[in-house]
Amino acid sequence: MKAAIRPSTLLRLALCTGVLAGLLLSKSSVMANSSTPVDLDFPETTETPEPGQYPALYDVPLALSMHDHFLLTRPLIIEEVTWPTSDFRYGFFDTKTNSLHTGIDMVSEIGEPVLAAGDGEVIFAGYGLIKGTLDMDDPYGIAVMIKHSFGFEGNTLYTVYGHLQKAIVEDGQIVKAGDPIGTVGITGNTSGPHLHFEVRLQDGQDAAVQNPELWLAPPLGHGVLAGRIQNDRGNFLPSKSFSLKSMETGKIWKITTYSQNLTNRHLNDDYFHENFVLHDLPEGTYEISTYYNYGFYKAEIEIAPGAINFVTFRGKQGFVFGYPEISDPAEFLH
């Protein structure tokens, strides 16, 4: 889909969805300053999967702004657009086990194929991911780690696939995106069959985890919402609940921000410094709302397809839309 922008055309955009002549587009008004019309290319959204079919994804790599990084494909074959509930999302802290959830859980049936999310080399397969040696008590159970043949801003990218029934690859094996690497299981610390999926940067250790929802390409016609939920002073509000409602369908998503255990360790994106992400949102108009200090705050936002859309809530100032300015992560902490 193309949109022609002519000189002196005033752009009013609800959210940042692209780059125009090196200028980041945001909610702020932007003036086209070229002497000729400029065409903006947005992802096509005309393909609609039949019921029961795997929803087509945008091709990777996909980045409609200089800060987007959809570099990975789905590690499971899914039949409909689904994503985890607010429980056990990235950044959730489980008080029962005193552990931080450093990935996302994707529910599936035992024995379903698990696929490589990108090209790379298998650097671990089996029990014992944490220690790097055989350990039948490892909480990941049978796991696979891939060191990818591509990275981001000079950092090497890794993915982890946990709780497998079995691994069908071995250390040193080269894989391509979509290659089967194992099957869904219930090994390790898990209460039911699912895939635990992680994205790691730099050295591949869990100290460098990132939210996978910012790295996995969305289905056609869908986008991602990320943001910061903060108090009046600009500090993160950990484990804070809020809602997102589709104005077209009435569907409601309940979302909880990252726990303080995660934000204190700076395990969020180096640019966004987000404390929540919600993936697989159909393009369209939404109402975002939350309670703060006995007040109720809400606003309408537009989700653009194939992009990371961003919103900030700052206490009594309410919601502000558009990509954030570059900032020091320490300023968000208490």
List each language-model region with its residue ranges.
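N-terminal Sec-pathway targeting helices
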Residues: 2-16
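Hydrophobic alpha-helical membrane-insertion segments, chiefly the h-region
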Residues: 17-28
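Surface-exposed, glycine-biased beta-strand/turn segments
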Residues: 30-143, 147-151, 177, 186, ...
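Short histidine-centered loop motifs in beta-beta connectors
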Residues: 109-111, 115, 152-178
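Conserved, short, structured surface segments that act as functional micro-motifs
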Residues: 134-148, 173-222
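Hydrophobic core positions of the immunoglobulin-like beta-sandwich fold
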Residues: 161, 278-279
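Short, acidic Ser/Thr/Gly-rich low-complexity loop/linker segments typical of extracellular
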Residues: 248-275
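Beta-strand-dominated extracellular/periplasmic modules and repeats
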Residues: 271-274, 281-282, 293
